Amino acid sequence: MNEQQLLENIASLAGAINQYKNEKEPTQVLDAAKANKNTRSYPYSVSRNYSFILNKSNRSKSTAASPPYVIPSTSSNADDANKEPEKQSTSDYVSRKNRHMQLIKKNILEHDLQARKANLESYRAKLEKEYKTLAENKIQQRLSDGTKQLVTIDGLQYITGVSDTKWLEFVSAKGQCPKYLYWNNKSYLLKKKRFLKEVGNSPSAVYCRYYNANGICGKGAACRFVHEPTRKTICPKFLNGRCNKAEDCNLSHELDPRRIPACRYFLLGKCNNPNCRYVHIHYSENAPICFEFAKYGFCELGTSCKNQHILQCTDYAMFGSCNNPQCSLYHGAVSADVPEQTEAPISKTAGSINPEDSGSEIGSNSLESNLDFISV
């Protein structure tokens, strides 16, 4: 083949190619226009159905080791052999419901939970540190004028006045504000949120005197004083063997020496009742009357107290007069002519207290009248 024939063959082949291109061009333009017309202008939404999550490393190993297709077998042995791997594979996954229901591997879930817990702890520590710094700055700003001071009571911080300590403000970053406390020989009771007010000089001043004397309080849970069942006054009828209410009685039936008065007959050396329920104790001749027991009907020291546990007005005993017209405590002196007690058994009949019964007080100094001394 010479050079001229080769050029003719090339020309004919190029013409055939150009003719083929010209025939296919209109259809390609139509297909492109159709494709542009059907193109989505927004992405596909995320599926809220079940999603299957696999570990990539385990997936590549499992796909390389096992064939892509499993030939079914009609024999029962083949079915059992195929079921065992399925149980093993599904036991490695657990379901988790976060935003979507997910099926996830156990090791991946444990790793995610540990990372989430670590992040939460670090975030909480950061917030606590910021809150503590902010609280300290506020405290320093309030103490800058010099009229207030910062005190620490039982590990908690309070702000109070330098000269006037009538109020305590709870400012501690940690802990909970107590309902009452005793500090600097003063009792404080929670009045408002984070504010405690001085209510007296005795630790017993925070307890409700109505509740202690009667066993109940009309204000109930709304009462701002403390209702402590262990500080209820002992039932005077129970001391004289005349209370038939037993467990239904609102007052206490426990012989606790911290709330039982001393036997006046024993103090005079004239108590002959072996079943006397009053406290038999000797006091010194010049022992004063216990203010805690006389006013609140309760003394923490009990029989170890050096003062007399008698329900008598302390003001009248010390100064000879009482300025409280509503005071219901005994105001007379103890008479030396008190007759000796008889050894008659304690009566179990319900009724009013008889001064002649064993263990009872005489005249206006009866225990039942002296215990009803509450006046606020």
Swiss-Prot record:
Signal peptide positions (record): none
InterPro entries reported for this sequence: Znf_CCCH, Znf_CCCH_sf
Location in or out of the cell: Nucleus
Basic and acidic residues composition-biased segments: 80-89
PROSITE patterns from the UniProt entry: ZF_C3H1
Record's keyword terms, sorted: Coiled coil, Metal-binding, Nucleus, Repeat, Zinc, Zinc-finger
GO biological process: nuclear mRNA surveillance of meiosis-specific transcripts; nuclear mRNA surveillance of spliceosomal pre-mRNA splicing
Zinc finger motifs (C3H1-type), residue ranges: 202-228, 229-256, 257-283, 284-312
Regions of compositional bias (Polar residues) in chain numbering: 349-369
Coiled coil regions, renumbered to chain: 2-25, 105-140
A cellular component term, taken from the record's GO annotations: MTREC complex
Pfam families: zf-CCCH
GO MF annotation terms: zinc ion binding
Keyword field contains Protease: no
Keyword Metal-binding: yes
PANTHER family according to UniProt: CCCH ZINGC FINGER (PTHR46156), ZINC FINGER CCCH DOMAIN-CONTAINING PROTEIN 3 (PTHR46156:SF1)
Protein name per the record: Zinc finger CCCH domain-containing protein C337.12
Organism encoding this protein: Schizosaccharomyces pombe (strain 972 / ATCC 24843)
Taxonomic lineage from the root: Eukaryota, Fungi, Dikarya, Ascomycota, Taphrinomycotina
